Amino acid sequence: MQNLIKTKQGSLALVLLYYVISFYLAYLFTKNFYLDGWLLILVWHITATLIIFLFSNIHKNSSIYDPFWHVAPIPIVFYIANQSSLSNLEQSLVISAFLFWALRLTYNWFLNWTNLDHEDFRYIDLKNNNKLLAFINDLFGIHLIPTLIVNISLYPIYITLTSENLNLSLIHI
C-alpha cells in the first residue's frame, strides 16, 4: 500500500476508488429513506462526506477531500436532471455550464496534486492543535462545512432543473 500512495497514478486510483465507494455507500444508505428532493440530496452528500472523512483519517491526509468540492456535485446534478421536466436542450444548457466548472476544477486539481503524501498546508495548520480540537477542525472545518457550502451552492441548479414554471430560454440565460 505504501508504494501505491507514493506514485501519482496509484494515489489517483485509490482516491477514485474511495470516491466510488463513498458515493455508492451513501446511495445504499439513503435509497430507502422517505425523503424528497433537496433533503435526500443533502443526506446523501453528508453521508458521502463522512465516508471520505474516514478515508482521510485512515491516511491521515485531509487532502483526499480536496476534489470532493467539484466531483461530488457531478452525480448530484445528474440525479437532479433525471428528475427534471425541462427539455433536453434546456437541461443541456444548465448541465454544460456546470460541467465546465466541475471538470475545469478537477483538471486543475489533477495537474497540481502529487500523491497521497501531499496534504494541503492549511489542513496541517488547522490540525496542529490538541487532539480534540484537531478532530473538530478536521470534521467540521475541512469536511462538513465545505460540503454544506457546496450543497447550498447547488441549490440554484436544483431549482432551475426541477421548477415546473421556469421559462429557461436563451434570453433568460
Tell what function each PLM region has.
Residues I171-I173:
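Conserved small/polar residues in nucleotide/adenosyl-binding loops
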Residues S22-F23, W44-S56, A72-Y79:
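Central hydrophobic cores of alpha-helical transmembrane segments in multi-pass inner-membrane proteins
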Residues L12-F29, A48-I51, V150-P156:
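Hydrophobic core of alpha-helical transmembrane segments in multi-pass integral membrane proteins
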Residues F33-A48, S63-I74:
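Loop-to-helix transition at the N-terminal end of transmembrane alpha-helices
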Residues M1-L17:
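N-terminal membrane topogenic signal
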Residues Y24-W38, F55-N61, S84:
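Short, hydrophobic transmembrane alpha-helix segments
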Residues I58, S62-S163:
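Intramembrane catalytic core of multi-pass membrane enzymes that act on lipidic substrates
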